Amino acid sequence: WFAQRRNFSTYNIINGICKDNRIGEYYNNPSFGYGGYCLPKDTKALAGEYGDSCILPAIIRSNDLRKKNIIEHLISLDKKIRIYKLNMKMESDNMRGSATYDILRQLEKRGIFVAVYDKMCEKMQFKECIKLVNTIEELDSNCDIIIANRMYKELKKISYKVFTRDIYG
């Protein structure tokens, strides 16, 4: 959010940080916030165990704030929003704890119409403002912005519409 508001290149910032050998470039690709089915639960458990004496509560608040800022930014754009897949990691068949899923649910709570392309959602129940689509062409049709936690090959031809934090996709 800091870099986005100042028009800084996230790619250049990350690459600069990765030059430090203690950090490296192996696992440093931002997303809409950390998630998944283990990390959020484990982070909260550790924060509960060690309380305010450690940095973990600040990390949890920062992650929640990151998603909140992304949601507010998307709403402020006043665009027709689509979401490509709700999973946290590429090739995963699980969306538990996904930041993209959290973003969808917040948009849904506000009654914002969103079309979603994700085969895993076929049996899920959503409010009227959420529509499931079956093809990339349907996803692309009549939309301004496509939210994608990761840049998939399927999205390359419409990448100019994709809103992602994936700097290597």
Briefly describe each language-model feature range.
Residues 1-169:
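Structural/interface elements that position substrates and couple domains in central-metabolism enzymes
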